[in-house]
Amino acid sequence: MTEKANKKYKDSVFVDLFYEDESAEENEIALYNALHDEPLPEGTKIRKIRVENVLYMNFKNDISFDVGGKLIVFGEHQSTINENMPLRNLLYIGRAYEQLVPVEDRYKKKQVKLPKPEFYTFYNGEVPWAKEKELRLSDAYEESGGEEMLDLKVKMININPDQHHEILEKCPVLAEYSQFVEVVRKHQKSGEEQALQNAVEECIK
């Protein structure tokens, strides 16, 4: 499996689980609860959001949802280390707010209320990396010091099984996804042409 194909299958499975499948809403709620100390009340409704304009294809694997006054953004999960996730999320959140706020409301005297954003990215690459790390947009500024008038924080979470991050215990579907990626990786290293199919068969036994 080529590197491009390898990345594509990971993107597809993650987006299916947390955006497109019939159980996606249930999975999103489970992941939200795993990330927060206070779980969502029973029966909470969520609104799924996705920037799908052809002009913004870089966002096609980024998903988000509006729930409880918050806009939870899951930036495209990473199989390679990417320190530019704060910048990508800044571009994404602008487009997401464009979808949420009607044009006419942006020019009214009364302030438009916005869901408070939270940004998360899950890392499952093979290069060793921190169990959890906060990336900040301000770290990329050419000039440091003083008060930043604009900043954005992204929580990067390493979901490789060997990291034993507590989120995998709290969110079984994310743990299953992490384990599936690990099984595919094992079959790939064996040089199998049907690594993905063989991994699927192993995981459903």
Regions found by a protein language model. Give the residues of each.
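Elongated, amphipathic alpha-helical interaction scaffolds
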Residues: 1-205
